[in-house]
């Protein structure tokens, strides 16, 4: 008897969930741009940097997938997964100090966002030829490339490459090796759009998305101290420690001073403001599942 009741209850839940189901799957294509400490500062629809070098730079592209669950004709929860290729170059900036600085680069940014969407008109109803503006906002995560560096401390060398003992604590070289590593941060996406339902199951939309990120590293303008490593050549050892002479005493103190000076000179821009990624996109969605019963 208990098994029959359990089966009946589960079947009832299944019927309710099917009747309440109204899903949309879609794709979005568009263009993304960065607003940060390097490059242009207009918030949307920045031009590609140099189409003649598209084979090297690519284009500032956005591509994504989305899923919508419509609670009623106006309210929707949606999940976005996307890829942004963003570019930035001080040569394209309006500010003289940026053009004189001439920093540049590109970044590959992957995103996942969960958002609430509100349609001003009942575009999620069954009827076709419905048009509605909408607003949305939520939270999400970004995975991006961030700068890293290794400061290589080495002895001065003679013409044959043989390490020379330092004559004082400043008599050694420090060079920098740069690299990129993946990082994850949060972002706050929001925006506006316009949705047109031209068929019982199909709709097109256009939207502008603004993402306030919780990082200042998307344009490589900032490197964190934890991302700066040091290495020490061990051709000459300290008899007391058995390690590199450059890792002992005043040599090590000088290496730390050089590390701090490197970080200070390497970081540019306003470290009190974070970066934005903004996108203008066009999309197409397909609705499936039985229409919900929007009961009063």
Whereabouts are the PLM-identified features?
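Short loop/turn motifs that connect adjacent beta-strands in outer-membrane beta-barrel proteins
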Residues: 20-22, 73-74, 122-131, 149, ...
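Residues that define the transmembrane beta-barrel architecture of outer-membrane proteins
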Residues: 21, 57-61, 108-112, 131, ...
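Residues on the lipid-exposed face of transmembrane beta-strands in outer-membrane beta-barrel proteins
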Residues: 27-31, 65-69, 114-118, 137-141, ...
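Transmembrane beta-strands of outer-membrane beta-barrel pores
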Residues: 31-35, 83-87, 120, 139-145, ...
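Surface-exposed strand-loop-strand hairpins of Gram-negative outer-membrane beta-barrel proteins
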Residues: 32-62, 66
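Outer-membrane beta-barrel translocator domains and adjoining extracellular loop/strand segments
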Residues: 37-44, 89-96, 127-128, 146-154, ...
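Extracellular loop and loop/strand-boundary signature of outer-membrane beta-barrel proteins
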Residues: 47-53, 97-105, 121, 174-180, ...
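Predominantly the C-terminal beta-signal and adjacent terminal strand-loop region
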Residues: 198-296
